[in-house]
A protein has these predicted regions:
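Short, hydrophobic beta-strand elements of compact beta-sandwich sensory domains
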Residues: 122-147
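Juxtamembrane segments flanking the first transmembrane helix
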Residues: 1-78, 84-91, 104, 145, ...
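Extracytoplasmic/secreted envelope proteins and their assembly/folding machinery
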Residues: 41, 96-99, 140
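Short, well-structured alpha-helical patches and their helix-loop capping segments
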Residues: 94, 115, 135-138, 147, ...
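Membrane-proximal, non-catalytic sensory/regulatory domains of signal-transducing membrane proteins
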Residues: 64, 89-130
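A structural microfeature
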Residues: 80-81, 132
Length: 153
């Protein structure tokens, strides 16, 4: 009888511990995701105040140091500059959600797996005064990678 009680109590404890850990991890991951998007907005606003954005990113920006991807897109969706990929191989971006939103409403955001880089990426885009769109992106780990990273294994 004592053995059955011990096994059930252990099982309940393990289930509760896993539940608590899951809720905690997903809560922190959501907070982390929100912070990433806020950081991207800040980067876009700072770059948008730079007079010659395209000249700055081509000359002074280093994606390895800044850990960001910057893309400049014209009003037709053609990529004028990308810090991480060859623009000659890139598709037209006019139908990307964040670009559509930026062209229509002045700014847009999205989270998706990047076709170009094959990674999960957060995107924030803002329409510049000249009509072009400045998009900043950051790669992030998935929630599963996040979980395995914090586990003591």
């Amino acid at each position: 009888m004592k053995r059955k009680i011990y096994i059930r109590m252990t099982l309940v404890s393990v289930i509760m511990m896993l539940f608590t850990m899951s809720v905690t991890v997903f809560t922190f991951y959501n907070l982390f995701s929100e912070q990433v998007m806020e950081d991207l907005k800040t980067h876009v606003h700072i770059l948008n105040t730079t007079e010659a954005v395209l000249q700055y990113v081509e000359k002074d920006f280093d994606p390895k140091i800044d850990n960001l991807r910057i893309t400049v897109i014209d009003t037709k969706g053609d990529v004028l500059y990308d810090s991480n990929a060859d623009i000659g191989t890139m598709d037209n971006h006019v139908n990307r959600p964040e670009i559509k939103e930026a062209l229509e409403h002045g700014h847009g955001e999205a989270t998706r797996k990047s076709d170009t880089l094959d990674k999960t990426t957060y995107y924030y885009a803002e329409k510049l005064e000249n009509g072009q769109v400045l998009r900043v992106a950051k790669e992030v780990v998935s929630v599963w990678q996040f979980i395995f990273k914090i586990l003591p294994i």
